[in-house]
Amino acid sequence: MATLATLGEDGRPQLSEVWFLAEDDQVRLSLNTTRQKVRNLRRRPGCSLLILDLANPYRYLEIRGDAEITPDPDYLFADRVGAKYQADPRDMDQPGETRVAVTVRPHRIRAWG
């Protein structure tokens, strides 16, 4: 799990727990298009991700960057994320809802531990 920070319409931060995949030097998320975090990213793509090592809370990775959003209507990416977390993302979506793949393009990466 990671914590995603986005900025709301009023400029205040919103924090959300999200599933992620790290692959090909990228961090990608699968998000439901009806959620506030997606609306925030469409308005302001700047975001931060914090990935905390649950076995050692003094070890973490912070990524600050911009979100690039691409449609995932067939759940091709969502299914890969779901496999990592042993869950089906469709179980979290209501009928008619769709998903996007969000790639965080880093401007700054900070690690500790």
Regions found by a protein language model. Give the residues of each.
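A short, polar/proline- and glycine-enriched secondary-structure boundary/capping micro-motif
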Residues: 38-44, 60, 87
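Short beta-strand segments
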Residues: 1-32, 41, 47-51, 62
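Short secondary-structure boundary/capping segments
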Residues: 19, 39, 92-94
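Extended aliphatic helical segments
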Residues: 18, 27, 38, 81, ...
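Structured soluble/peripheral alpha/beta segments that form catalytic or ligand/cofactor-binding pockets
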Residues: 35
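Charged, gly/pro-rich active-site loop segments
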Residues: 54-113
